[in-house]
Amino acid sequence: MARSTGLAHPVGAAAPDPARVLGPDAVGRRVRDTLEDVFAAVAATRADTAALLTAAGGTGRAPFSADLAALRPGLHGRLAAQDLVSGAGFVAAPGLLADVPAWLEWWQRGPDGTVRPLLLDLDPAHSAYSDYTHWDWYALPRETGQRAVAGPYVDYLCSDEYSLTLSAPVHVGGRFVGVAAADVYLRHFEAAVLPVLLELPVPARLVNARGRVAASTDPGHLAGSLTKGPDFAAVLAAPPGVHRHGDLHLTPCAGTPLVLVTPER
């Protein structure tokens, strides 16, 4: 697994400027603001997909993979408009489509800025990628009915980059039909949130529902590592407020599915 490119509080570093010190709630809101535009893009893909599949169902037939081509103009526009987003699309639940067992209608932005499709062999007879249902970016929205942040992980499926995936479930008529999602390169996410974390007077890390560290200024807890002990999914599902686990303060990031973890001072 690739290592984080993130910064950490260096040993012996000067204390943060008191005039710039933020509290955990303020940092959580800043992190939320960083990711809300990405989640807005995911929500738009979810709405487009639900409308498309509802219309297909109204014709009395099951949808085909070719029907999902109607999502492409919106996906291309979101990739062009969102600097943080490196890839976006819809991942169909197995068995949803009449002509293929699995499908990703997925587009990504290349290094030169061009938008291109992800072409995968999803034939279960000879593809290691045919069952994507166990990956957190798919499983968490399916299990919880809520949006999720998965990773960071090396995205062998799409880019071979260390990435986060933000996703949300898509339902049609009360039935789960797949997830809408967007990828964010970890290096871009860290560039956006590490300056905010560094405004805290203590080392801190952002942790997802599975306990995976998404960004950190704590040299003892690097991005990609697991924080064991707290039930972060329960923290995210609880009413807003600061939670405690031993000497750790756990602050949900204002509606975004990440928890800010800081030590007790």
Each model region followed by its residue ranges:
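Juxtamembrane extracytoplasmic/periplasmic/luminal helical "stalk" adjacent to the first N-terminal
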Residues: 2-66, 161-163
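Short amphipathic alpha-helical segments
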Residues: 28, 39, 43, 64-79, ...
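Extracellular/periplasmic ligand-sensing ectodomains of membrane signal-transduction proteins
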Residues: 84-144, 215-220
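Short, glycine-anchored, charge-dense loop/turn motifs used at functional sites
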Residues: 95-96, 173, 204-214, 219
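Short, basic/aromatic recognition patches
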Residues: 133-158, 186-197
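Conserved beta-strands of PAS-like sensory domains
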Residues: 159-193, 260-265
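Solvent-exposed, extracytoplasmic
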Residues: 184-214
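Extracellular/periplasmic juxtamembrane segments that couple receptor/chemosensory ectodomains to their
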Residues: 221, 228-265
